[in-house]
Regions:
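N-terminal periplasmic "start-of-domain" segments of outer-membrane beta-barrel proteins
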Residues: 1-12, 16, 40-43, 59, ...
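Non-catalytic regulatory/gating segments with a bias toward low-complexity or hydrophobic composition
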Residues: 5, 13, 24-25, 84-89, ...
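Short, conserved catalytic or interaction motifs in soluble domains
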Residues: 10, 30, 89, 109, ...
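A general structural signal for stabilizing positions within well-ordered secondary structure
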Residues: 15, 22-25, 75, 94, ...
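Extracytoplasmic beta-strand/coil segments of soluble accessory domains associated
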Residues: 22-66
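Outer-membrane beta-barrel translocator/receptor signature
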Residues: 57-58, 70, 79-82, 93-163, ...
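Short acidic/polar hinge/loop motifs at secondary-structure boundaries
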Residues: 64-90
Length: 180
């Protein structure tokens, strides 16, 4: 089956500072992701399903083989990834329904078997927006042929604008994600 595919490695994702689906579209030609108030609108090569909450997305995201096809579910951060594969065009033969526009396939990093405990942590701060983001992962060998990996991220932000009427900053963010 002929496929148009672009693959970004986990190291490349970190180097480019890609932290969410919206920033991914800056580096993949033909992919447009717009964040609305409560969901993403995803278009690949101009094909998408728009903002109708009753429809599944025409471009489906897969995380470790599990389909995520509602726009609200795309809000999860890109956490501890080995690679992201972007397959353009209809992918119904390989991935099934709701893939008429294409597929964004995310593969999580696997634990290291037989090695030592491995940790990675990062802290990002944007003082002018009162934003703090902490991310980390640990790979723990349990035996010579079994290991586990735990990854987590937390982000807090007071927002990037000031509402004079309510006398507060916004829109605020407070999110946590954990994968084991």
């Amino acid at each position: 089956v002929p496929i148009s595919i672009q693959v970004l490695s986990g190291d490349k994702i970190e180097d480019l500072g890609i932290t969410n689906m919206e920033s991914l579209s800056n580096y993949v030609p033909g992919l447009m992701i717009n964040k609305g108030a409560a969901q993403f609108n995803i278009y690949m090569r101009g094909v998408g399903s728009g903002t109708n909450k009753g429809f599944s997305q025409s471009v489906t995201q897969f995380i470790d083989g599990m389909a995520i096809n509602r726009g609200e579910q795309y809000l999860a951060p890109m956490l501890d990834l080995e690679r992201v594969e972007v397959l353009k065009g209809s992918q119904g033969v390989l991935f099934g329904k709701n893939t008429i526009g294409g597929v964004i396939n995310m593969v999580s990093r696997s634990p290291e078997i037989g090695g030592e405990a491995d940790t990675t942590w990062s802290i990002e701060s944007v003082p002018e927006w009162s934003t703090l983001k902490l991310s980390g992962a640990v790979s723990i060998p349990v035996s010579d042929n079994f290991a586990m990996r735990i990854a987590a991220t937390h982000e807090e932000s007071d927002g990037w604008t000031y509402n004079a009427l309510l006398d507060e900053d916004g829109p605020t963010t407070d999110s946590t994600a954990i994968r084991a």
